[in-house]
């Protein structure tokens, strides 16, 4: 029997649990905003950093396919989710919180991309796998 689906499911359960935990730990008031989805924002930025780091290691074949399925597809797939990001943005727009919605959308995308780039750079330059 192929256990690849079980690895993905186990990783997804872990990632989803971590996402829920981080979401509950974050305050809803952030900087000057009364309502800001900081939990999802944090999860997406952290997840982008980690997937950048792990992506470089995967390309360099540092770990096997099973671990990649477990961690990248499962854990990170369960941990980060742009569907939650989309829903949170829509909710802000529906409440006419336009500045929060735009700040959230732009911040998630810009910092997420920066996180991927930094993760990739660190894996490439400090783990010593070129």
UniProtKB/Swiss-Prot annotation:
Functional description taken from the UniProt entry: Fluoride-specific ion channel. Important for reducing fluoride concentration in the cell, thus reducing its toxicity.
Cellular component terms (Gene Ontology): plasma membrane
Organism of this sequence: Helicobacter pylori (strain Shi470)
Positions of transmembrane segments: 3-23, 39-59, 67-87, 102-122
Molecular function GO terms recorded: fluoride channel activity; metal ion binding
Location(s) in or outside the cell: Cell inner membrane
Name this protein carries in UniProt: Fluoride-specific ion channel FluC
Membrane topology: Multi-pass membrane protein
Main location: membrane
Regulation: Na(+) is not transported, but it plays an essential structural role and its presence is essential for fluoride channel function.
Residue positions binding Na(+): 77, 80
Lineage summary: Bacteria, Pseudomonadati, Campylobacterota, Epsilonproteobacteria, Campylobacterales
GO BP, sorted A to Z: cellular detoxification of fluoride
Catalysis performed (reactions): fluoride(in) = fluoride(out)
Keywords per UniProt: Cell inner membrane, Cell membrane, Ion channel, Ion transport, Membrane, Metal-binding, Sodium, Transmembrane, Transmembrane helix, Transport
């Amino acid at each position: 029997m192929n256990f690849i689906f079980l690895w993905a499911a186990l990783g997804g359960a872990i990632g989803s649990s971590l996402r829920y935990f981080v979401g509950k730990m974050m305050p809803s008031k952030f900087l000057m905003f009364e309502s800001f989805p900081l939990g999802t924002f944090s999860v997406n930025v952290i997840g982008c950093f980690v997937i950048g780091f792990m992506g470089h290691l995967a390309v360099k074949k540092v770990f096997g396919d099973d671990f990649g399925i477990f961690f990248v597809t499962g854990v990170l797939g369960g941990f980060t989710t742009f569907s939650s990001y989309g829903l949170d943005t829509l909710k802000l727009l529906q409440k006419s919180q336009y500045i929060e919605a735009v700040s959230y959308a732009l911040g998630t995308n810009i910092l997420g991309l920066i996180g991927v780039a930094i993760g990739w750079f660190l894996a490439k330059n400090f783990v010593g796998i070129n």
